[in-house]
Regions:
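A charged, well-structured terminal subsegment
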Residues: 198-218
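Short, well-ordered strand-loop elements centered on a beta-strand within folded domains, enriched
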Residues: 8-14, 183-186, 243-255
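C-terminal terminal segments
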Residues: 30, 86, 214-265
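Helix-rich terminal scaffold detector
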Residues: 59-187, 191-196
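Glycine-rich, charged/polar anion/phosphate-binding loops
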Residues: 20-22, 50-57, 159-160, 170-172, ...
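Short, glycine-/Ser/Thr-/acidic-enriched flexible segments
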Residues: 41, 73-74, 140-141, 189-192, ...
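Short, glycine/charged-enriched hinge/interface segments at domain edges or termini
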Residues: 1-110, 249
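Solvent-exposed alpha-helices and their adjacent loops that cap or buttress functional pockets
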Residues: 4-5, 27-29, 42, 57-62, ...
Length: 265
């Protein structure tokens, strides 16, 4: 549009279509439109739509409540430790995931090698609470002080398994308390074993409770050779890249041992 100050009129240099630049009621959202499906994970885009439409309250599922125990005299929360001690990375790693995977996290400290009675009493109390998942780290293998499985079996269970053909993470334990919506995951103590079991057992369990869509695997071309034992399912730390023509390539990284963290960064 151009305004001519001399002749005091506006020169329109193009034709207008009827109703151009007019916003009609219902042109964006219509009455009874479904905004989001049930079990959808709400993101900032949904919040924008809710506020635009004046939606003040929505029904959501409660976050899962997780209680966490570490175990072993060798585990320490201190930064400065003697040579026989290990810093407690598993507790902090899992806690850091609570916002990503919709759970509340409470740490109940480190169980010492002779804390069988203490662990039993704690479990007995927790099973009366609103806790959904109990996680232990370490103490599930076949060592002298690995008492976690023995204590768990003292409770009435509807489901139980221990040890899977998986690396890292072979010693994992799972138990469901009979007549209660409460489960126990016993994770191995090595950092990568613990991380793998949390990722491929605990997170899918949480997603299932919340009604989230099942994950689909991504397939790609392996760039380097990798040998594994046939009887084991193997999870390997890898680097995924996309080529210029859109192909997915996967590189298996060095340092696959379950105690090595560097290649996980």
């Amino acid at each position: 549009l151009i305004k001519d100050k001399i002749n005091n009129y506006i020169l329109i240099k193009q034709k207008f279509k009827k109703f151009e630049n007019v916003r009609f009621k219902g042109s964006d959202f219509k009455k009874k439109d479904l905004l989001i499906k049930k079990n959808t994970l709400i993101n900032p885009n949904h919040i924008m739509a809710f506020k635009t439409l004046g939606v003040g309250n929505i029904k959501v599922k409660k976050k899962i409540n997780i209680i966490f125990f570490s175990s072993g005299n060798e585990i320490s929360e201190n930064n400065y430790i003697p040579s026989w001690k290990i810093r407690n990375s598993n507790h902090h790693y899992i806690k850091s995931l609570k916002n990503n995977f919709l759970f509340n996290f409470k740490n109940l400290g480190i169980l010492k090698d002779n804390d069988e009675k203490k662990f039993y009493n704690k479990l007995h109390k927790i099973l009366k609470s609103k806790t959904n998942i109990i996680i232990t780290s370490g103490g599930v293998s076949k060592g002298k002080f690995d008492f976690i499985p023995l204590i768990i079996k003292k409770f009435k269970l509807s489901h139980f398994f221990k040890d899977v053909a998986l690396r890292p993470g072979k010693p994992i334990l799972f138990a469901k308390i009979k007549n209660k919506e409460k489960v126990i995951f016993g994770l191995p103590g090595n950092p990568m074993s613990s991380a793998a079991c949390f990722r491929f057992f605990v997170i899918p369990y949480i997603a299932n409770i919340l009604g989230q869509i099942r994950e689909k695997p991504i397939r790609g071309v392996l760039k380097n050779s990798f040998i594994k034992k046939k009887k084991f399912t193997r999870f390997a730390k890898s680097k995924l890249t996309t080529t210029k023509d859109g192909k997915i390539e996967i590189e298996i990284l060095k340092g696959q041992e379950s105690f090595r963290v560097k290649s996980f960064i």
